Amino acid sequence: MDDELREIARLEAVGELSAAHARAIALAQAHPHDVRAQLAAAYACDRNDREHDAIRFYDAAWKLGVPTAEQPGFLLGYGSTLRNVGRTDESISILTDAVRRFPDRAEFSAFLALALHSAGRSTSAVATLLKSALQAARPDGFGPYRLALAEYQKLLADEAAH
């Protein structure tokens, strides 16, 4: 299986996404109880704009138990894909949990902001995106306006909470 996973990664790296997708699906079907095979299929479906297909592989991986080292990428991919297929409440739940579990990873807040926007929660989305931008910015990012932006972010977050 390791050789097959390496071959899928190689195909993706050289842009042969359809071939990688076909191999990943075959691998997941041949190894339904292997979380690595399910993850490979989920990610390959996502890369081929087959988000609805990806969901069943994400679900299978979740049930099998995603290894700790794989959880950040899994949670981001799963949460984003749920949003893309219109399951925004589930997306928000997963991404909110990811923000709590990985507070130093600004990408989770950015994807959570997209999910909040998709759910029509614009104030929360802007507050979350602003938080992500402030978190990811270099120390001198936003210059003398950093404190003002941080205050606006707090005000928006408070407004969204009420």
Predicted regions and their residues:
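Short coil turns that delineate tetratricopeptide repeat
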Residues: P32, V66-A69, P103, A137
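TPR-repeat structural position
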Residues: L17-S18, E51, T88, S122
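Alpha-helical adaptor scaffolds
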Residues: L39-R101
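Tetratricopeptide repeat
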Residues: S18-H21, I25-A28, I55, W62, ...
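TPR/TPR-like (Sel1-like) alpha-helical repeat modules
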Residues: W62-K63, H117-D140, A150, K154
